[in-house]
Amino acid sequence: MASSSGDSVTRRSVASQFFTQEEGPSIDGMTTSERVVDLLNQAALITNDSKITVLKQVQELIINKDPTLLDNFLDEIIAFQADKSIEVRKFVIGFIEEACKRDIELLLKLIANLNMLLRDENVNVVKKAILTMTQLYKVALQWMVKSRVISDLQEACWDMVSSMAGEIILLLDSDNDGIRTHAIKFVEGLIVTLSPRMADSEVPRRQEHDISLDRIPRDHPYIQYNVLWEEGKAAVEQLLKFMVHPAISSINLTTALGSLANIARQRPMFMSEVIQAYETLHANLPPTLAKSQVSSVRKNLKLHLLSVLKHPASLEFQAQITTLLVDLGTPQAEIARNMPSSKDSRKRPRDDTDSTLKKMKLEPNLGEDDEDKDLEPGPSGTSKASAQISGQSDTDITAEFLQPLLTPDNVANLVLISMVYLPETMPASFQAIYTPVESAGTEAQIKHLARLMATQMTAAGLGPGVEQTKQCKEEPKEEKVVKPESVLIKRRLSVQGQAISVVGSQSTMSPLEEEVPQAKRRPEPIIPVTQPRLAGAGGRKKIFRLSDVLKPLTDAQVEAMKLGAVKRILRAEKAVACSGAAQVRIKILASLVTQFDSGFKAEVLSFILEDVRARLDLAFAWLYQEYNAYLAAGTSGTLDKYEDCLICLLSGLQEKPDQKDGIFTKVVLEAPLITESALEVIRKYCEDESRAYLGMSTLGDLIFKRPSRQFQYLHVLLDLSSHEKDRVRSQALLFIKRMYEKEQLREYVEKFALNYLQLLVHPNPPSVLFGADKDTEVAAPWTEETVKQCLYLYLALLPQNHKLIHELAAVYTEAIADIKRTVLRVIEQPIRGMGMNSPELLLLVENCPKGAETLVTRCLHSLTDKVPPSPELVKRVRDLYHKRLPDVRFLIPVLNGLEKKEVIQALPKLIKLNPIVVKEVFNRLLGTQHGEGNSALSPLNPGELLIALHNIDSVKCDMKSIIKATNLCFAERNVYTSEVLAVVMQQLMEQSPLPMLLMRTVIQSLTMYPRLGGFVMNILARLIMKQVWKYPKVWEGFIKCCQRTKPQSFQVILQLPPQQLGAVFDKCPELREPLLAHVRSFTPHQQAHIPNSIMTILEATGKQEPEVKEAPSGPLEEDDLEPLALALAPAPAPAPAPAPAPAPAPRPPQDLIGLRLAQEKALKRQLEEEQKQKPTGIGAPAACVSSTPSVPAAARAGPTPAEEVMEYREEGPECETPAIFISMDDDSGLAETTLLDSSLEGPLPKEAAAVGSSSKDERSPQNLSHAVEEALKTSSPETREPESKGNS
């Protein structure tokens, strides 16, 4: 008790002396260094909370009182970073911060330790490390800037600092809320540091002397201004991205709001991004927040907006900030109080500039005169330039696009539509945050609404702003990403090197490693020197009596004495080693244990296995002694004892967890004889997945080093090739393939593989497959696993010996169905390993055995799945198909190698196959096996394939199969673009006779690509000239197409002869009234040119069918179109409404007819030229189609095959039918009357309005292509206004 009280008095005196005497030695005459030593010793022994108090005293002494001692005691204090106490580890982090602030050169030694503490398992330690890095990053950057000559150690140190900063940014995704909060504050400080301080930047008092980007010289030899600026902007993006995360917590969101406000005030160049982030948050509050948390977030958002509003740089964003504050329920009076005064905005730049100049004078070493000249433009100019660089954001562009569209009618419609999706009861969260809308309908409120909607659309990746930004930033992004990656890679490598130097051994690999503090050494155990045993005291002489010596011992005593003697010899290992008699001891033990029973052997074995590496000599001595005893016995000797010794050693080694040094292999290879039982132990060792490689390496060594029994060892390895464990089997196959390369082993391995392969011919798997330890009935059926057991070795050898493929074909023909299916599943990879140029594989294809057709086909598919077939393979398959096996399925794998004529001849047979097979055929022909639309290797381009399907004779193939095949083509939208389909329809229309499926294809093409409407109208008009009514099925489709494209098809219907026009009305009487209304909308001058026979049919009722003149039997001439063209000629234009330009004069009828004929000829000529220039069928006339638009899902889906031979059905709803107008003149009044109300047909597309408003020059023959292209493009906002008027 006295001593303990004395210790406490001593400790109290040291502590009190520290606080009372700042100068001079202590009361006991101790120097400061001695006091530090004493305190450190106390800290090492204390385990309670007072350890922190003692360590803080040490810190005060060596940092504040006598900094010269800092380097001396640095290692001793840093050693406490491994302390179990969390508070002690946090103290070490704080000590590192204070030490580096006192002497920045210490950062070279301490940064690696701080890096380790940043990865501590305790959350509080990590948070303390993040706080320390917030300060040390600025200190380290300032240190690097001041150093004009950078050493390798400084580079490595800065690389690790930068890497740690990147890791802390990644901690924004941590699972812990506290860590994320500290990471947010670190990112805030990083952004302020890595961005230039402007004239109007707010500078907190504590940060007046902190470094920022504007203080870094642009010509610094190591620190690159532009790289740091890019990292700062990237940190801003990370923080903004984190804040809008939908699962962000309330505390993180509150912290992020405050950080963004600080960034906006201190770095006004980011004001725009901050305001936009606040708008996004206001419109998209995280759904995970509770009601109280929502209120808290909104309150914080209001406070931060008010603080930002006070800043002079917020003048440009006052409208947005004010609107947000009003939405958050802020009174106008409070907003007015926080408005920045003009006086402040005038005064502040001057004050800040002066303060900046003062700071530059206080720190002249940061840059030289010539460096300051680079920064002459001043902070204010940089601020404006940086503000202009950013330009409009995605939200701004989308908001400007939406604002003119927010008319009262449109807003009312949006409200009505959204009413359907509203919940029946008002959510409590909405009720809590709802504030009445003030000044509704004003321009400011509309602008705010547009920004709210733009924010939602931008967050969803929609709107013109997102699209424009993507297009503008694609190329710059690619250029900017390259350099930072190289920098980051460099830093990662250097950080890894430092980490290794910290945790590695004490060997000095580089100067940097010497300076990094090493981990404390663990004390090595002191081995006590064994004392020699003293002889018993027997000083008194005794009379020798024989009876005393010859007392008999019991058997137990004898055994105990022998066992004791052996144990003493075993324990004397170290003492004998010192005396130099180790080999004698080993011989004695080996001789003794060979003569003793199993009990003694177990003791020696246990002793050996305790430290196999050190006692391996004893094991081998024992093993060879047992073998010598067997040899000495001659013919009467047995191997039992030797075998027991070897098995015990191998089994004991097998139970050892760590065998990386190959002791097992050494015992096996140096054993004089490997018995059957020992071989079984080796086999079990190989079956251990963790030791399979080592065990099989041992077997391989036995095979090569013991040739007398190499086939016995090889057989064990071959048995393992069909093992049920994948890892064991794969290792065995790997070693066997190496053995197969040896000539002396090749025949045995091959024979073994073929024997296993021949087992597949048996009706049931033989018992050899199940192993000796498994009791399985011989009559068990084949399973996939047992089949694979017979194939593993064979398939592994097949790529090395291609001749084996013929054996597989022979077995395949005799195997049962289940075996065949398994063979087909596993043959793919080995066949690919052989390659399509293998002579043996080509021979198999040429001499395909009967019954192996499926196998050969599977091989062909595996070879040609990803690469085109070789000419030699195509030749063999062609010969096989034409000469021996006329099964069209053989041609499928080599379709891309056949001639176009051969593919067309085989099409009728191919499309009658199973639907899955037909799909594979089309995938190969269209090049879409792997999701790509590339038919460059196909003998048929997509257009030729579709035309060939239309030309298939219905006698050779039923129409239902042809329709299904065409549907497969239409399902490939990436291949069958609008250009391809236009060329297909053009060529089909020019055929004679017309294909039966022509109109079905036209309707499907129009459904897929509504922009083909104008081209389809031309097709219909030319079909009239070819007397389409002579082809009943095509005529039926013609009428269907006209019915679905009304009112645009009215111009085509009016070109029909009277009799055919009457037939149209018979089948579709609903067309009569709209067509009659269309004609009556013509001017009197135009109606005068309508033939009376046509008008009679139009005006006739169902009861009166007038007699009409029979249509001419020959093909229609161009003169026959004259009456209709005259009817459609423009009449004198009525007095137009006041407009910028008068309407053009009407064109004479003769000019109109000439125009019509010129259009037809120009269109045909252009189609022919396009077809010649692009023989692959990819292109199409520019006058017909333009870029393919996005199509609704209903139109995108593949066509549904019809049940009847001809059924003209659209693939989507009828409202998707395009309403495309073909104008024949310039009369605007005619255009308006032709654009009928499209409510029955779906919304009027923009193409109609575009064509309707096109000019006379655009419709001239030479400008036909340009006019149609412009009609197919999306209409501009100016064109949208007359369209809306026409619809209304």
Swiss-Prot record:
Phosphothreonine found at: 1274
GO annotations of cellular component type: bicellular tight junction; cytoskeleton; cytosol; nuclear body; nuclear stress granule; plasma membrane
Gene3D superfamilies: Leucine-rich Repeat Variant
GO biological process, one term: cell adhesion
Motif (Nuclear localization signal) on chain: 345-360
Residue list for modification Phosphoserine: 13, 494, 1238-1239, 1260, 1276
SUPFAM superfamilies: ARM repeat
Crosslinked residue numbers (Glycyl lysine isopeptide (Lys-Gly) (interchain with G-Cter in SUMO1)): 361, 1256
Source organism, top-level taxon: Eukaryota
Record field: compositional bias (Polar residues): 380-392
Biased composition (Basic and acidic residues): 349-362, 1163-1173, 1267-1288
Pfam families: SYMPK_PTA1_N, Symplekin_C
Membrane topology, record value: Peripheral membrane protein
Cross-link (Glycyl lysine isopeptide (Lys-Gly) (interchain with G-Cter in SUMO2)): 361, 483
HEAT repeats: 31-64, 67-101, 104-146, 153-192, 227-266
Region (Disordered): 335-392, 1130-1151, 1163-1288
Biased composition (Pro residues): 1131-1149
Subunit structure and binding partners: Found in a heat-sensitive complex at least composed of several cleavage and polyadenylation specific and cleavage stimulation factors. Interacts with CPSF2, CPSF3 and CSTF2. Interacts (via N-terminus) with HSF1; this interaction is direct and occurs upon heat shock. Interacts with SSU72.
Annotated family: Belongs to the Symplekin family.
Protein name: Symplekin
Upper classification of the organism: Eukaryota, Metazoa, Chordata, Craniata, Vertebrata
Gene of this entry: Sympk
